[in-house]
Structures are given as structure tokens and as C-alpha cells.
Amino acid sequence: MISNAIARRYAKALVQLGAEEDAVDRFGAELGQFAALLEGNADIDSVLKSPAYRIEAKREILKDVLAKLSLSGTVSNFLQVLLDRGRISFLPQIAHSYAAFADELSGVIRPVLTSAFPLEDAQVESMKGALVKATGKKVQLSVQVEPSLIGGVITKIGDKVFDGSVRTQLNRIQDILQKG
């Protein structure tokens, strides 16, 4: 939990800098680019995160990587601060929190709609329209198919779940019948 609080604090600071520079999307892309590079290159990742290497060596490696990626000065400085403070290992969580703060700033929600069967485009658009109307925000809807639902849909927005599946309704009926 402490790591999430740390990640959120750093992410919020970078989003605020991005808002001041009108570069929230660009900073998010650059942060994601660097996080993907670390994820795809275990050698660089382990050197930057390992306490066995001197900070000067880590700074040189980071400097070389940043030069090749051509990241903005703000994001480069941000990554150097993370390295200097021993927080570079929090980068995946920071990138995730950054995306959430950026969405909040731009009024975007990313609900996940799960249905028992593939939905037609008109049905998806109808659900999207209902979510826009209910939340007053831009909606980036993700649709999944889960046959075990039997029927109906489950909509997840952040940490809220709206379960209208047949499976859940049958489970409720079963609970009522068992309790007598």
C-alpha cells in the first residue's frame, strides 16, 4: 500500500507539470515508452534497480538511455529524480497512476463491459451513450465476452461494479432458496 501512495504522489506531480506545460498526453506517452523499454530490457532494468551498482554508474546508463529516446526535458528530469531517490522500481505503478490522473484531468472514464455473448455495434454504442449520460464524462469503453455469465452484462467503472448478469441473479435466487 505504501508503494501505491508513493507512486500516486510522483504521478500526480508529473501530471501537474504536464498540465502546466500543456503536455499531459505527451508526458504519458514518454513515461510509457520508458517503462516499456525497462520491461523489454531486463539488463537495463536490473542495473537501474539494483543496489549493487553505484549511483554514478546508474546515472550514466540512464543518461545514455534518455539521449537515445529523445524524451522531453521534464520527463528526463523526472526519471533522474526517481533514480536519485531510489524510486525507479515504482515506475510501472507510477505510469499506471499517471494514466488514471490524466484521464481524471481530461474527464475520461474507461469502463469495462463484460457480456455473455458478443454485442452488436449498436448495443455497444447504446451502452456507451448511457454511460456518457450517467457520468457526464467521455467514455472509452472496453468490451469483453465471458460466456459463464449466461446472459446480461457486468459493467465495471474504476472500482465500482454493476452486475446485471444472469449468473449473479441465479446465484441470488439459489441463496434465497437455501436460506428458506
Swiss-Prot record:
One of its GO terms (molecular function) is proton-transporting ATP synthase activity, rotational mechanism. GO terms for cellular component: plasma membrane; proton-transporting ATP synthase complex. Keywords: ATP synthesis, Cell inner membrane, Cell membrane, CF(1), Hydrogen ion transport, Ion transport, Membrane, Transport. Pfam families: OSCP (PF00213). Its main location: membrane. It is a peripheral membrane protein. The keyword Transport applies. Transmembrane segments: none annotated. It is found in: Cell inner membrane. F(1)F(0) ATP synthase produces ATP from ADP in the presence of a proton or sodium gradient. F-type ATPases consist of two structural domains, F(1) containing the extramembraneous catalytic core and F(0) containing the membrane proton channel, linked together by a central stalk and a peripheral stalk. During catalysis, ATP synthesis in the catalytic domain of F(1) is coupled via a rotary mechanism of the central stalk subunits to proton translocation. This protein is part of the stalk that links CF(0) to CF(1). It either transmits conformational changes from CF(0) to CF(1) or is implicated in proton conduction. Belongs to the ATPase delta chain family. F-type ATPases have 2 components, F(1) - the catalytic core - and F(0) - the membrane proton channel. F(1) has five subunits: alpha(3), beta(3), gamma(1), delta(1), epsilon(1). F(0) has three main subunits: a(1), b(2) and c(10-14). The alpha and beta chains form an alternating ring which encloses part of the gamma chain. F(1) is attached to F(0) by a central stalk formed by the gamma and epsilon chains, while a peripheral stalk is formed by the delta and b chains. This is ATP synthase subunit delta. The gene is atpH.
